[in-house]
Amino acid sequence: MIDTLPIPGIEDYDKIYWENCSLNKLSIQHCGDCDKPRFPPRHMCPVCQSVSHTWNEVSGDATLWSFVIPRPPLLPVFEDQSPYIVGLVELVEYKNIRLIGQIINIPKNNLDSIEIGDKLRVDFKKIDAEISLPCWIKK
């Protein structure tokens, strides 16, 4: 059973993403050849198969595309946070890129106030020395 917080592993192709998150910056990987944005970061472009890539910082503004309130929590480690909202958000700069993260500023007694289409802003939750996870605040 998983009883500790699951931490993403850092790979060579997503190291800059995690470094930027630790600096409270959200960035999206682009192909260095065809300039196609992609998320999650990966080693090779799915469009042209180039291994070249660049990074573009984004505003952190997003729209709630979907969400779930897991009941009971998915893992025992999340018991203290329960109930909580996990959102699938669409970045304003990229209508085809969606990220998953916890929505952190909704009181537990008011979880029903969240709606698809709500405007959100990124925030970052420091997990350890290397990892800060993007999470979301309702505007």
Where are these regions (language model features)?
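Short aromatic-glycine-enriched beta-strand elements
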Residues: L74-L88, I131-L133
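Short, basic/aromatic beta-hairpin or loop at an interaction surface
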Residues: L88-G101
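Short, conserved beta-turn/loop elements at beta-strand boundaries and strand-helix junctions
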Residues: F67-P73, Y94, K108, I127
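Short functional micro-motifs and their immediate structural scaffolds
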Residues: F39, H53-T54
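Residues immediately within or flanking Cys/His clusters that coordinate Zn2+
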Residues: K25-I28, R42
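Conserved hydrophobic positions within beta-strands
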Residues: A62-L64, I103
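Short, cysteine/histidine-rich loop/knuckle motifs that typically chelate Zn2+
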Residues: H30-D33, V47-S50
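Well-ordered alpha/beta subsegment
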Residues: I100-K139
